[in-house]
Every structure is written in structure tokens, then in C-alpha cells.
Swiss-Prot record:
Converts 2C-methyl-D-erythritol 2,4-cyclodiphosphate (ME-2,4cPP) into 1-hydroxy-2-methyl-2-(E)-butenyl 4-diphosphate. It catalyses: (2E)-4-hydroxy-3-methylbut-2-enyl diphosphate + oxidized [flavodoxin] + H2O + 2 H(+) = 2-C-methyl-D-erythritol 2,4-cyclic diphosphate + reduced [flavodoxin]. The gene is ispG. This is 4-hydroxy-3-methylbut-2-en-1-yl diphosphate synthase (flavodoxin). The lineage of its organism: Bacteria, Pseudomonadati, Pseudomonadota, Alphaproteobacteria, Hyphomicrobiales. Belongs to the IspG family. Keywords: 4Fe-4S, Iron, Iron-sulfur, Isoprene biosynthesis, Metal-binding, Oxidoreductase. GO terms for molecular function: 4 iron, 4 sulfur cluster binding; 4-hydroxy-3-methylbut-2-en-1-yl diphosphate synthase activity (ferredoxin); 4-hydroxy-3-methylbut-2-enyl-diphosphate synthase activity (flavodoxin); iron ion binding. Pfam families: GcpE (PF04551).
Amino acid sequence: MSSETVSYFSHPFPRRQSVGVSVGGVIVGGSAPVVVQSMTNTDTADVDSTVAQVAALHRAGSEIVRITVDRDESAAAVPKIRERLERLGHDVPLVGDFHYIGHKLLADHPACAEALAKYRINPGNVGFKDKKDKQFADIVEMAIRYDKPVRIGVNWGSLDQELLTTLMDRNQAEGAPLSAQDVMREAIVQSALISANLAEEIGLGRDKIILSAKVSQVQDLIAVYTMLAQRSNHALHLGLTEAGMGTKGIVASSAAMGILLQQGIGDTIRISLTPEPGGDRTREVQVAQELLQTMGFRQFVPIVAACPGCGRTTSTVFQELAQTIQEDIRRNMPLWREKYPGVEALSVAVMGCIVNGPGESKHADIGISLPGTGETPSVPVFVDGKKVATLRGPGIAEDFQKMVADYIENRFGLGRKIAS
């Protein structure tokens, strides 16, 4: 596995050298930053709900969105979805997720084949027995015809059973057999690489192929992608499948992908969270962004630093203010990205007592240190390391929000550019 040192912001890290792939104009791999993507959970045949969810995911920051294409009605809806999104100003690339009958759907619906930016193929269910290679080739030939990239996406839950059985039998015949887990990992990697080689033999360029090998256990994911990275230079899509709900899914995905990303492995990521009933699908986009930003690989939104609280901070004022500021930033980012270039790098601190509050606030671009229990009820505000104001009274939160807005305008706004 070859690597080069790439520096995004102030955090250099060894980045595995992969072949860049253009997905609807978004570059995955090569020297491009790690791309955030997501997937809808709507019925794709329902154009209205799918358009609404894709638009929400795109507004949240998803740079590629995958949609299910599982039947004729779904395939027929894809060009309508693409057209509607473009009218709404959402030019996000759409990826078609195909299983079992993708070859037939692409052949029967050429407008769908044209509207999609990428096709996802699962080697484990693209076809069975003597039909497998033919149906895989049909999709690859469609990709060549329409000049589209493909993701060869292996999933341990639908792994090619013939390949797995062959490797299990071969392993059993050897004197010092590997564990069943090791054979499973090898089968996943081989399935991806064999399929990629076949696609290239058919005529699809390596700059049109992305690989993924998804499992549900953290150590398996680390092992499988390390093997893939060592044995190919294809662009890699990272994702922990069936990660779960809530904090479990967030922690598992972040643990696995954080280790791989730190090693320079991974060109695009998706955080696969099981949404709670009525939950917000865009949560997975936010988590992916925060993972990359926390590790210093990309910047998406200003991050608010806030202390966790202790016995000195019995008041909830600083917690409420930190939440308000973070929510306000998230809500305004679609506008701010256009109006204030570079605002993603802003750092804000909302601290709760005198112990670390002033110091942390000085380290941020703009910070506030609220009083802890028994401390003087005055609130110093620091801008670029210097104390600029002391707030008092019931309007502290509103006053600080205005100061943050003014700081953004003065530092990142048009007036600053004209003055310079």
C-alpha cells in the first residue's frame, strides 16, 4: 500500500494513494478530500418523498446520495427525481442501489441509467450459478455505455456462498487451517477484487471503480479494509453495515472508521445509523461530518467547544447556550457557506466556570465563560484571545449570539474582503 502525506488544514496524515473516480462531478479518491455520502429510506417510486429526503440530506451536507432501485416503478421514477432536484437547485449525484435484477432494470429503463451518477453492484446477489457472470457483465457494459462509475459493494450478509464454500474447503484441506472468521474476511476481500478484475477485463477503467466491503463488527471492518488497501489501489468506500441505533451505531462506526482514516484508508464514508421512529435521517450526515472534522481531515461547520459540567456548574445556562449556539450554526450553515466563505473554520467556546473557562475561551476565535456556582455573576467574552466585553443580566444568551453573528460578518463577510 503506497501512501503520500496530505495536509488538510493543520493535520497532516498519510493518505493511501488510490485512483480517483468522478461521481457526477464529485471526485472520490486520488488526492480529493474524503467525501460524505448518505442513503434515503423512502420508497423511490414515491417521487415526492424521495425528492424531499434527498434535498434534506443534501442541505445537511451529503455530497452523494444513494437511492434504492428495486423494481420497475422505482427505475421509472429516477429521471423524475433527478429533474425535480435540479429544479430545486440540488445537483447532488444520485447512486442507484441495485440487487438481483439491476441488469434488467438498467436495460429496460435507459432514462434511469442516464440519470444516475453511479451504479452499485452487489457481487453476492447480482446473479447465481451460470447467470452470475453474465448479469454482472450486463451492468458493467451499461456503465461503459453511459460512462458511469460503479461501486462493487460486497456485504458479509449477502456474500457469494460459492466463493465462501470454496475457500472454506480449501482451508480445511490445509495442515494449519485458518479460523472461520479469517476465511470469511478473505472471502469478502476476494469477492471485491475478483469482481473488480472482471469489470476491468470487460472494459471498465479503474477510474470508474470504487470498492466497498461492509461487515457489522468493528475489528472485522478494520481487518478487511486493511487487506483491501494493501492489495489494490481502487478508491474505497467505508461503512459499517448494520451499525445499529443511537449512540451504539455512532460509537461503532466512529471507532472503526476513525482507525482506518487515521491510517489513510478510505475515500468516502457513510455512517449507517438505524433511525429512531420519526427520527431525522440527516443525523447520519452530521455524524460523518463531525467524525472527519474532529479528526482534522475536513471542516464543515464551526464546532462549539463546551465543558461537560461538574459540581461547580449546577446552573444549566451554559449548557443551554452551547446547544442554542450549535443549533443556530447548523441552521444557518447553508446560507453562511455562500455568504461567508471560510466560516467553517470558526471556533466557538461556551464554558461554565472560572477553572478552565477563560483559558478555553481565549483559545477559541470567540468564547464566553459563564460563572459557576457561587462565582461573581459576570460573563467575560473573549475575541481572538482578548477580553472584549463583560455581559450581565438576563439577556446574556441573546447578547452573545449577536456578538457571534457580528464576528462572522466582520471576519468572513464581504465588507472584510473590500477593506482588505
